[in-house]
Amino acid sequence: MLTIGCVGIGLWLVGIILSDRFTATQFCSWIPAIAMTPLCLLAAAAARSRRLTTCWCLIAAMTAGWWFLVDQPWRPGEGSSDGLTLMQWTMSHDKSDRVTHADYIVETDADITILTHGYGVRGTDEIRNWLGPDAKPYKLGFFTVLTRLPVRQLRPLAAGMDIHARIIEIDTTRQLGRPIRIAAVDLPSKLTRSRWEIARTLRTWLDERDAGRIDIALGDFNMRRGSAALASIFPDLTHAWDRAGHGWGPTWNRRFPLYRIDHVLVADWLGVLDCTTHDPGIGWHLTQHVVLDGPREVDAAED
């Protein structure tokens, strides 16, 4: 048991230090700190000296502390709902219960809703009635865009090697002081695919295809929050959860969410008033809800 504990802690530390920069270490980076806590306690129980028992108990406390203080899967409190609301949902591939999906979207009533694998939901009467006669659902590759705000641009950016990215520009001048450009992203989930190579490929495409200014990047990245690969794709954006997260943070899988693989990254000029996840009651992913505000200089000018 002591050997297993040492190996487990060693692999976990490798994942913390090297993250997913290498294919071999990315497996280690998926080890949740909280999984190490019971392992360390078992090692403490198996230790043959008081000193070793104390040592393993301290390591167990450290892993639990890391989980709650660094990984921060839970944050108390509530944010403000007075702002531009954005929902991202990586939907299931199941098309058999479109009305249930649509009802959840309508009930949420976000200003901007971006779906991955939206498929038949966008054609339901529930969605069309909710949007009203002056708006329509937009299909953009893997993605569905639902909003009553003026959509200024829908642009394909990347689609190959199971890497999908699209640019969406929406006129939010009244709400945020300027339009926002959103990069909707869906990246491979295969565990053996190098996350670092995926990130490098997407970053290269963004540069070569002149993606322009990106204010928000969102979607199913299949990378953990804090991933080195994730940070390398959009180095100028920060995680909305880091700025204003509340409640339970992980988004997958829905029944027992342990990992945050769906992300909303935002530019510094945007104010983040709240970032939460919610259980839609269907599918594999929790939904992400973000409340945004404009920059301070815009607010000051309006006053």
Name each model feature, range by range.
Residues L86, S92-V106, H117-D303:
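Soluble catalytic domains of enzymes that build or remodel membrane lipids, polysaccharides, and related
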Residues M1-I127, R296-V298:
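N-terminal, active-site-proximal structural segment of metallo-dependent hydrolase catalytic domains
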